[in-house]
């Protein structure tokens, strides 16, 4: 899950849309040109990634008429937003706090605490009145900014992704899988993983604060392992042959 979400964020960064206030939106709905997890062509998607290490506590002004969620960088559910969230589809202000935050928490927000600095801010817009109306509603109401700049927030920027073929977020199935995982481990507080998982990744050489540099023997083992794991998942989960 961590590598999957890491590569989703890398897809945003490859589009020069990696800042908290930079939001991707599919104004003409999704299409097969964008390669993203569980993606379809009937939803008006919009998403971005928070950077709580850089920005500190961050406000998301959620528009009415959306359905979404916040996930941390281990793909753990944090909170529903929109119709299934505490704003009940009417829109509202969410305040996302970074790991270990002990400062003041102002009133007037739906408060969400994160175990990671990175947070996926994801929602679908209802298109009962058409994609154009949903796009205008979202772009007019969705705002993301640091709490420290609430009195003069920076503009929230949108990029229309419909029809663009450059957006690729699929996790790798070669050795770079482990390099992605190591990069995420180095930039997040290690407490976001439980001790058992920390031990498992340490056994293959991924340790917080240390370089990931397997020798040729271990590199071959890991390269084979990720290819076999990918094939196993495809054969047994993605497209099983059981009736």
Please provide the spans of the model-predicted regions.
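A compositional/structural signature for long, glycine/proline-rich flexible linkers
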Residues: 1-243
């Amino acid at each position: 899950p961590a590598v999957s979400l890491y590569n989703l964020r890398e897809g945003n960064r490859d589009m020069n849309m990696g800042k908290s206030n930079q939001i991707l939106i599919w104004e003409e709905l999704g299409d097969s040109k964008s390669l993203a997890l569980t993606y379809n062509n009937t939803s008006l998607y919009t998403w971005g990634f928070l950077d709580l290490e850089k920005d500190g506590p961050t406000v998301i002004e959620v528009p009415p008429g959306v359905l979404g969620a916040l996930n941390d960088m281990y793909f753990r559910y944090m909170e529903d937003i929109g119709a299934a969230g505490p704003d009940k589809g009417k829109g509202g202000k969410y305040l996302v706090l970074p790991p270990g935050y002990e400062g003041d928490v102002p009133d007037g927000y739906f408060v969400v605490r994160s175990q990671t600095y990175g947070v996926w801010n994801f929602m679908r817009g209802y298109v009962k009145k058409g994609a154009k109306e949903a796009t205008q509603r979202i772009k007019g109401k969705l705002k993301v900014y640091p709490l420290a700049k609430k009195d003069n927030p920076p503009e929230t920027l949108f990029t229309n992704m419909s029809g663009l073929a450059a957006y690729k977020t699929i996790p790798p199935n070669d050795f770079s899988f482990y390099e992605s995982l190591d990069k995420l481990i180095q930039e997040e507080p290690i407490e976001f993983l439980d001790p058992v998982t920390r031990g498992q990744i340490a056994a293959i050489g991924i340790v917080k604060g240390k370089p990931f540099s397997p020798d040729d023997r271990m590199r071959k083992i890991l390269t084979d392992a990720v290819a076999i794991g990918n094939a196993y998942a495809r054969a047994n989960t993605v497209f099983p042959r059981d009736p």
